[in-house]
Each structure stands twice: as structure tokens, then as C-alpha cells.
């Protein structure tokens, strides 16, 4: 519903601004430019979607091997000690625990098709424990904040889009996204725990979060000792080594489980073309809307207005052109994806704005969509502090993304 209003707004605002330009400033080129943008954006959306097919097929095939090889189950077991402490109100041994672990593990691996059904199942099981069926419980809120914070280990789709948009190293945003999404998730856990009076000084929580924070701090410190050229080389090499290790680990997991690895890959890869075709109408819709909005001059007015405010406060304004992706992400995944593609098209995939847009896209998730779908599936209408915690986690992710982008690419 929110995206519907935003999409309508793109056209209405663009039309009003174009009329003002025509009537008061004699700009006879604005309407031809807007119409040209609709054709160009439609063509771009189609070409991008088809170009995604090969890389999507590759990674969907790899993910299918990991899924059948038990990687999701293994990750769920690894996460269980910390998550038990974050959900103290769930009775020990209740089946919802398994569903929550599996959902978070699937999300971390980028297995959206598996994560959503598991998440809906977890909500149904949490609702069984809910004494007030129309009101969100603490475990429900913690579960959804972990989802909205966007914690992911493998940002496949973003790397795929960067490859299609001509990035020299599509994986160079891999480590920055890992760092940004860590801060988003950490903020979400801390804020929600404070609301729910969960003891963050518990030994398990301290060791897990503290250990993860130390690793992240070490990474940031290590990269901080390098000049920009060496940092780019090391981060790109490290990202590609990690991705290759993940592929090898998934294959070995399949071999260990006696899975026919080749057949599993083919089974997953078949979905690549279907997925690429399925996103065509969504990408056409959002890119055309953004194209009209940009061609009318409205996007420049918005960005320049924010730049003026940031500049007046003495801040660096390089990040401002990427902000539309960050602002759209809590509202709509497809809308934010369109903003990201538009930023890479306009400024270049390897520009600071293009890279930061990708980090924004990977650092958080679609907060309002997730809350609407998951709470709506069980009839919960009183969300309590869910929206506040989710949006504060998003804000932390956005701030972290900007700082990390300046560190790596500024």
C-alpha cells in the first residue's frame, strides 16, 4: 500500500514540477525528457532482468546444494545458544524455537524462499503461546526485529546487480555490507532487549555479542591502517576468498550428506530464469516511476535540498545522492532495489554513490512489509514497540553504512 502511494507520487509530483517549468520558465524540453525516460527506463529494466539470469542461476544452484546439505540446520544449531537467551519467555523445548532458528539461518544465507514460510510458521507457533491474540508478545517483537535488521552473510542479489551494471569488482561491497548489517542487527538486539528488560550482561550474550564486536573492531582497525588502494585490494580479495570458501563448504556439505550435488545445483539453477522474468514488471514499474521523477528535475531538487541542509551543518555531502535507497528500504524492497539500480545507472556502479546505494540495500530489510505480513498472518494489530525497534535498527544500519562507505570508498 505504501509503495502504491509512493509510485503515484512519483508521477504526480513530476507532472506538477514539469508544468511549473513549462509555464513559468519556458522549459519546452521537460515533457519530452520525461517521456523519453519512460522508454529508456523500460528498456533498461528489461535488459537488467535478463542479464541477471546467469548469475542468479549460479547462486540459486549453490544455495540449493547448501540447503540439501544441511547448512541451514548446522547454522541454526550454531545460533541456538544466543537465541535461547534472547527469547526467555519461550518454554524450553517448544517447537517454535526450531522454526525461529531455521528462519534466521535461512535469512543469513539469503534463502528468502525458505525463510518466509519458516517465519510464518514461527509466528503461528508464537501466537499459540500468546495470551492476548491481538497484541504482539516480546518474543514476536524480538523475532521480527532480527528479521527487519537484515542480517545476511551472502548478499547475492546485490552482487548480481552490480555485475550486470558493469562493476569492475561486483564483490567489493561484500565486506562493507557485512559490517553495516552487523551494526544494524546489534542495534536492534540491544534496543529490543532494553525495551524487554532482557539481561544483556548474561555470560552467553556478552561472549557472543562481545566476540562479534571484537572481530568487527579488528576488521575496521585493520582496514584503517591501510591506504585506500591497498584497502580496496585486500577487501576485494578477502570477499572473493570467503565466497569461494562458501561454495566449497556447501559442496562438501552436500557430499557429506550423500546429496547428488550436480542434480541439486541444476534443480536450484532452474529457478534462475523464472526469478529473473518474475522481477521484470516490478523493475519496469519502479524504474519508470523514478525515471520520470528524475527527468522532471524533482529528484535533483530533493537531493540538492538535503545537500544544502547537510552542507549548512558543515558535513560532507557525497552520501546524499544515495539516500533515496536508504529512505525507500524500510517501505519497499522492490522500490529500494529500483533506487539502487537508478543510482548505479546515473552515477556508475563503481562510483561512491553507486556503492553506498548497494550497502544501504544490504544493511537493512523492508521493516514495514515484514511487520505487515508477519503480524497480519496471525491477526496481531497491536504491535507495541516493534515499529520503534525496527526503525531504530534501520537508522543504525544507515549511519553505519555511510561511515563504512567513507572508510572503504571515500
Give the residues covered by each predicted segment.
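Short glycine/serine/threonine-biased micro-segments
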Residues: 12, 59, 68, 108, ...
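Signature of multi-pass transmembrane helix bundles
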Residues: 1-54, 163-293, 311-313, 385-410
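Hydrophobic alpha-helical context, especially transmembrane and signal-peptide helices
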Residues: 5, 33, 45, 94, ...
Amino acid at each position: 500500500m505504501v509503495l502504491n502511494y509512493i509510485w503515484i507520487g512519483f508521477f504526480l509530483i513530476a507532472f506538477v514540477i514539469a508544468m511549473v517549468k513549462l509555464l513559468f520558465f519556458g522549459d519546452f524540453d521537460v515533457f519530452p525528457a520525461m517521456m523519453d525516460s519512460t522508454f529508456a527506463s523500460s528498456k533498461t529494466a528489461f535488459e537488467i532482468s535478463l542479464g541477471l539470469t546467469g548469475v542468479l542461476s549460479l547462486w540459486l544452484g549453490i544455495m540449493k546444494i547448501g540447503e540439501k546439505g544441511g547448512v541451514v540446520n548446522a547454522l541454526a544449531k550454531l545460533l541456538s545458544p544466543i537465541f535461547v537467551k534472547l527469547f526467555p519467555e519461550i518454554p524450553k523445548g517448544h517447537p517454535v524455537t526450531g522454526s525461529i532458528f531455521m528462519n534466521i539461518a535461512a535469512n543469513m544465507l539469503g534463502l528468502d524462499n525458505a525463510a518466509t514460510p519458516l517465519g510464518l510458521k514461527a509466528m503461528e507457533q508464537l501466537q499459540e503461546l500468546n495470551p492476548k491474540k491481538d497484541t504482539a508478545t516480546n518474543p514476536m517483537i524480538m523475532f521480527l526485529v532480527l528479521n527487519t535488521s537484515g542480517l545476511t552473510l551472502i548478499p547475492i542479489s546485490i552482487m548480481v546487480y552490480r555485475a550486470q551494471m558493469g562493476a569492475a569488482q561486483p564483490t567489493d561491497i561484500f565486506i562493507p555490507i557485512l559490517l553495516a548489517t552487523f551494526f544494524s542487527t546489534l542495534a536492534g538486539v540491544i534496543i529490543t532487549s532494553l525495551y524487554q528488560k532482557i539481561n544483556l550482561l548474561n555470560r552467553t550474550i556478552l561472549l557472543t555479542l562481545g566476540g562479534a564486536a571484537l572481530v568487527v573492531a579488528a576488521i575496521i582497525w585493520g582496514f584503517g591502517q591501510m591506504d585506500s588502494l591497498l584497502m580496496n585490494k585486500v577487501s576485494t580479495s578477502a570477499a572473493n576468498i570467503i565466497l569461494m570458501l562458501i561454495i566449497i563448504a556447501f559442496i562438501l556439505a552436500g557430499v557429506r550428506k550423500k546429496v547428488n550435488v550436480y542434480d541439486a545445483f541444476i534443480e536450484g539453477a532452474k529457478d534462475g530464469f523464472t526469478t529473473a522474468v518474475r522481477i521484470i514488471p516490478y523493475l519496469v514499474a519502479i524504474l519508470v516511476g523514478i525515471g520520470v521523477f528524475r527527468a522532471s528535475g524533482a529528484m535533483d531538487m530533493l537531493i540538492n535540498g538535503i545537500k544544502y541542509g547537510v552542507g549548512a551543518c558543515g558535513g560532507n555531502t557525497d552520501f546524499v545522492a544515495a539516500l533515496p535507497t536508504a529512505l525507500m528500504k524500510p517501505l519497499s524492497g522492490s522500490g529500494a532495489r529500483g533506487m539502487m539500480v537508478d543510482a548505479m545507472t546515473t552515477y556508475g556502479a563503481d562510483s561512491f554513490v553507486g556503492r553506498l546505494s548497494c550497502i544501504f540495500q544490504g544493511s537493512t530489510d523492508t521493516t514495514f512489509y515484514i511487520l505487515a505480513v508477519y503480524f497480519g498472518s496471525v491477526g496481531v494489530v497491536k504491535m507495541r514497540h516493534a515499529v520503534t525497534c525496527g526503525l531504530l535498527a534501520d537508522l543504525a544500519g544507515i549511519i553505519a553504512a555511510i561511515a563504512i562507505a567513507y572508510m572503504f570508498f571515500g
